[in-house]
C-alpha cells in the first residue's frame, strides 16, 4: 500500500517505517527535517503538521491509501484542530487513518476498557486534553464522512532506540553502582508496551477490516510497580540494585520534576497511574505482547551498542541522597 507516516524519524516511527519497507509498501515520511536517513526507498515531505496551510500545500497533488499519524509536538502541543487539518489535507480515498493516541487520553484511573469515557475537553493537562479531543474529532469524522479511523492507546513505550531518557536512565546508574531513588514506597503502578509490539498492532490495524471506527488499548496485560520495573532492569544488566525510598513530596519540593531537567526517576515515568485492559486488541488485532524480560533484554543489547552519551551529572541526585528522609522498605508487592 501507499503509506504516509507523519513523524517517522524518531522512535515509534522509525520502527514502523522499517517494517513497512520490509513488507513491500511504498512509504513517504512527513516531518520538519530535510532528510530522514532511510535512503532512497522512502520519500520525504518537508512540512510542519501543526500548520494546516503548510500541510495542504505539501500534500497537494499527492494521494495515499494509509496514513499513520504518530507525531506529537511536545513544545507547542498538537491539537484536535491540527489533526482534523491533516485529515482534510489528504487527497483521494483513504483505506485507513491510524492515529497514535495514548492511555493518557483516559485522564486517570485503572483498568480502562476502550468504551470508557475519555478526559473532558477542559482537562487540565495539555497532553491529556489534546489526545482525548483528537480522538473525539477523528471518530466524529468517521461518523460524518466515513473516515476509516483507528486509534491506538499505548502506555509507556519502551524498546531499542528510545530517545527518551527512561530505560537508559536506570542502566546508567545501575552500571555505575549508584543507588536508585524510588519515589514513595515504589508501589505506584506503571504499564508498558514494547515498541515492536505497538508497530505490529498498527500494521494489523491497517489490514483488519473490523478495526475501522475503533480504539484499541495496546499494552502488556499486567502493570508493574515502580520497584518491579527497576528490578527487571537490574536483572537484565546483571547488576545489584539498592533502593532509596524517598517521600515524593520531598523530591518535588527539592526541585525534582518528572519532565526534568532535574530528574529523579527517569523522564516522565513518575506519573499518577493509568492502566488499561487489552482484551479487545487481543481479540480483533490478535495482539500478543512480548514478554517484558525479553523486550528489556533486546533493549539492553541496543543500549550497549549505542550508549555513547556524555558523562552523566549526578549532582542533583547526590544532594537528594545526602539530605533525603528515607522510608522503610515496602512490603512485598
Place the predicted regions along the sequence by residue:
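N-terminal Rossmann NAD(P)H-binding glycine-rich loop of SDR-like oxidoreductase domains
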Residues: 3-25
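Glycine-rich Rossmann NAD(P)(H)-binding loop
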Residues: 6-7, 159, 183-188, 216-223, ...
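NAD(P)H-binding glycine-rich loop region in Rossmannoid oxidoreductase-like domains
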Residues: 36-39, 43-92, 99, 105-106, ...
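Conserved SDR Rossmann-fold cofactor-binding beta-strand/turn motif
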Residues: 153-154
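Substrate-positioning beta->alpha
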Residues: 164-170, 183-206, 213-214, 294
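Conserved C-terminal active-site "lid" loop/helix of NAD(P)H-dependent oxidoreductases
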Residues: 195, 254-288, 307-308
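Mid/C-terminal beta-alpha module of Rossmann-like enzyme folds, strongest
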Residues: 204-265, 298-300, 314-333
